Amino acid sequence: MHITCEGKAYELFEGATPQNLWNMVSGGRDPETAVLADCEGDIIDFQTPFTGDTDVKWIPLGSPLAHRAYQRSLIMLLAIAAKEVYGGKIEVAVKHALGKALYCEFSDGHVPLQKELDVLCYKMEEIVKEGRDITQLTVGISKAEAFLRLKGRKADADLVTQMPVKEISVSQCGTFIDYFFGPMLPDMSFLKIFHLSSYAPGFLLHVPDPCLLYTSPSPRDRTRYRM
């Protein structure tokens, strides 16, 4: 494949990803300067293979596009932490946005106290420090639909069946697999800023402003989010 990036041309193997290209061109730059790839208007994550010849522009962590990937990856982080804390017996459901936060509930309906949320938050921090990779798997639409219906996500399952494709990419981190409707960050190490707070009957997952993702947070911001 013929790939151009930052005014230079590269010949990459079939199946190459933006991560492969970034490894070639980064030159020791901060990883946060490139977390997604803009392939002539098609935004893909670092794990998704190029589909053919293209020109690549890098999207930094502080951009609005990367902020949406940050939010999706943060939801995945929360789900993984809940699976490990509760042994798979209790899942987390993201219900809707509430201001700049996401309102969530536990699958068994219990109302969490802040102390319980702090335990969940610490587990999330552990996963971030480990820097667990986020990878992509290709599955057929029928399998994706069945998976989403099994998880009780009927609206998402209906949406998947309307896609004009035969296969989609699902995200995997360790043994956890789910579909998040968009590009993800390269790995969990980028999710350094987040917070959980009680909000009966559920809780809030606080997502930071985009400007905080590419700057050093102020002391006031540090009190609002975990670092």
Q: How does the language model describe each region?
A:
Residues A16-G28:
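Short amphipathic, charge-patterned alpha-helical segments
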Residues D53-T54:
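Loop/turn positions that initiate beta-strands
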Residues Y214-D221:
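Conserved small/polar residues in nucleotide/adenosyl-binding loops
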Residues H110-F181:
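Acidic low-complexity segments
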Residues H96-C104:
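Short, conserved phosphate-binding/catalytic loop or strand-edge motifs used
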